[in-house]
Amino acid sequence: MSVALRSFAETSPRLTHLQRLEAESIHIMRETVAETENPVMLYSIGKDSSVLLHLALKAFAPGRLPFPLLHIDTTWKFREMIAFRDRRAKELGLDLLVYTNPDGLARGIGPVSHGSEVHTDVMKTQALRQALDKHRFDAAFGGARRDEEASRAKERVVSLRTAQHRWDPKRQRAEPWHLYNLKKRRGESLRVFPLSNWTELDIWLYIERENIPIVPLYYAAERPVVRREGQLIMVDDARLPLEPGETPELRKVRFRTLGCYPLTGAVESEAATLPEIIGETLAARTSERQGRVIDKDGAGAMERKKQEGYF
């Protein structure tokens, strides 16, 4: 190595692990916006969406976001999630689109009356496809991470979808040296995952470092829950019918992941601060998605959902 190169290497600032992840995510977002015509960010209100939004605001500062946010509202999210969504949209002046499957709404589709598979298909997957078609979005940012679940582990950062929004694992493109192929045929679209290489721990460390607001449900507090099939389900409103002999009890719980409340299990916890959550995450030996009922809809359930157009 020459003296000049050695001097540069010794004096140039070294990026931390979080700084490298941040830079990678911002690069992915900017590249996607530059190479697509009508991008959108899928906003599910959870911790990953909060980090994704924070990164987007950094990526395009000081200007406004060059794309809207899209929330697929199943009408079964926790009340605190919806309140948080509306508050953040107002605080940040976001262009927020909220979409609910009108047919599913008219039919009264829900996780209690129709089960998790039908509810997820109609109110999430079909709703998402409808919204993307309605607004003609050709690229959608999502907050999925590879460490969450097996099918997500093998999906590329830039995921090609057919005109019907289906995912074919065999059509994935190579992404050597962080080079992303954003080309597509007419009618096709892309799902783009800037957080692919982040872990659950990375997310929490970044939230702490950047002081990112998150839904209070992530913090431990006393909440009314019932135990069903090994899961602590929070009784968030009167739509959750109690089974014979079932009585909600107050337990100190928090959520590692958030979805539709009858399909999302809480964990007993004392972690009421970010350092305590980080400590719990370091000690955890189970996936954060252990509380997602939809992941238990049979072997390969998530991969089938993704092939049909799920997030």
UniProtKB/Swiss-Prot annotation:
Keywords: ATP-binding, Nucleotide-binding, Nucleotidyltransferase, Transferase. SUPFAM superfamilies: Adenine nucleotide alpha hydrolases-like. Pathway: Sulfur metabolism; hydrogen sulfide biosynthesis; sulfite from sulfate: step 1/3. The keyword Translocase does not apply. GO terms for biological process: hydrogen sulfide biosynthetic process; sulfate assimilation. The keyword Metal-binding does not apply. It is an enzyme of class 2 (transferase). Heterodimer composed of CysD, the smaller subunit, and CysN. This is Sulfate adenylyltransferase subunit 2. It comes from Methylobacterium sp. (strain 4-46).
